[in-house]
A protein has these predicted regions:
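A eukaryote-biased signal for short, well-structured alpha-helical docking elements
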Residues: 2-28
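Residue-level detector of beta-propeller blades
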Residues: 19, 93-95, 173, 177
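Ordered hydrophobic segments in well-structured contexts
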Residues: 20-27, 49-56, 80-86, 153-159
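Contiguous beta-strand segments within globular domains
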Residues: 32-85
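Residue-level signal for secondary-structure boundary sites
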Residues: 60-62, 93, 164
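Extended low-complexity, serine/threonine- and proline-enriched intrinsically disordered segments
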Residues: 65-113, 155-160
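Internal, hydrophobic beta-strand segments that form the core of beta-sheet-rich folds
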Residues: 79-86, 127-183
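Extended, solvent-exposed segments with strong compositional bias
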Residues: 92-143
């Protein structure tokens, strides 16, 4: 019972097709149709531009519909969609949560989205990502994982979840990993 369609945007282009289920990283911001294989980066220095794109096979709403504990009302699911980011730093997991972003119709439709960890020239307004990097660095630093001059292999997994409707008690229903990527 919803005014939102079940159809999402599907696979948008060859880059999307080649990287379904992956998070890819870049040193500058790219639109979905501008990003190319040569745009991808594997290593970063903290403080330089760090951007990412999540490529999923279906929208977050479609990934969550039908899961135990999730409403069958597509609009309610779209309203409650949020993402977690699980970072594995040298094999040690740190769970973080993205702030909610996007309109309900976007959460229902989008199969790819972009984010930024560090944008040296922010002009795009609110873009997801910097909040999970801040949390990763703070928690990793306090756990003794990060030290000046140290190098780390970091894997990021993106996981959709559905929060309970406004005013309702309960924990979010957490879905499967929909995309994963590694960088150093």
């Amino acid at each position: 019972t919803s005014s939102l369609p079940a159809q999402d945007q599907g696979i948008l282009n060859e880059m999307h097709r080649a990287h379904v289920g992956e998070v890819v990283f870049t040193r500058q911001d790219f639109t979905v149709h501008a990003i190319q294989p040569s745009s991808l980066a594997d290593t970063f220095d903290l403080g330089t531009g760090m951007f990412f794109r999540v490529y999923m096979d279906r929208s977050a709403v479609n990934a969550m519909m039908g899961r135990p504990g999730v409403s069958n009302d597509r609009l309610q699911v779209a309203a409650g969609i949020q993402y977690r980011a699980r970072f594995e730093v040298d094999g040690r997991a740190i769970e973080t949560t993205f702030l909610p972003f996007g309109e309900w119709s976007e959460r229902n439709m989008y199969t790819t989205w972009r984010g930024q960890f560090i944008n040296p020239t922010p002009a795009a307004g609110v873009v997801p990502g910097s909040e999970v990097l801040r949390e990763l660095v703070a928690r990793g630093w306090s756990a003794g994982l990060f030290r000046p001059g140290s190098m780390h292999r970091i894997t990021m997994s993106v996981i959709p979840m559905v929060n309970p409707p406004d005013g309702a008690a309960g924990d979010p229903v957490v879905g499967p990993v929909v995309a994963r990527g590694t960088r150093s």
